[in-house]
């Protein structure tokens, strides 16, 4: 089963997450099919901390991918931000 979830990167005490489409059996930071965005929870003020390719997320969910709870929250937040800016 395909899932869209967070894969951790960055260094110790400086987390950085990639939003990836991957098989649910793969490891958290293992092999993935496509990177659909990123999330930086400790980004400096005024820098971009979240970017998601909403079109690709819709494509994968249309093909049966599930969103993890954290990714679902981030997608909701980002789509509200994008629609408010438009």
UniProtKB/Swiss-Prot annotation:
Which regions form coiled coils?
none
Q: Carries keyword Ribosomal protein?
A: yes
**Which is one Gene Ontology cellular component term of this protein?**
small ribosomal subunit
**Which GO terms of the molecular function aspect are on file?**
structural constituent of ribosome
Q: Which Gene3D superfamilies does its entry note?
A: 3.30.1320.10
Q: Which HAMAP family does this entry report, sorted A to Z?
A: Ribosomal_bS16
Q: What is this protein called?
A: Small ribosomal subunit protein bS16
The organism of origin for this protein: Bordetella parapertussis (strain 12822 / ATCC BAA-587 / NCTC 13253)
The uppermost taxa in this organism's lineage are:
Bacteria, Pseudomonadati, Pseudomonadota, Betaproteobacteria, Burkholderiales
């Amino acid at each position: 089963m395909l899932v869209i979830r967070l894969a951790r990167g960055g260094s110790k005490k400086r987390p950085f997450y990639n939003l990836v489409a991957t098989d649910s059996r793969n490891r958290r930071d293992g092999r993935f099919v496509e990177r659909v965005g990123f999330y930086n929870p400790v980004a400096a003020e005024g820098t971009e901390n979240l970017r998601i390719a909403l079109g690709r997320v819709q494509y994968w969910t249309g093909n049966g991918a599930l969103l993890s709870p954290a990714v679902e929250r981030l997608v909701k937040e980002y789509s509200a931000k994008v629609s408010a800016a438009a």
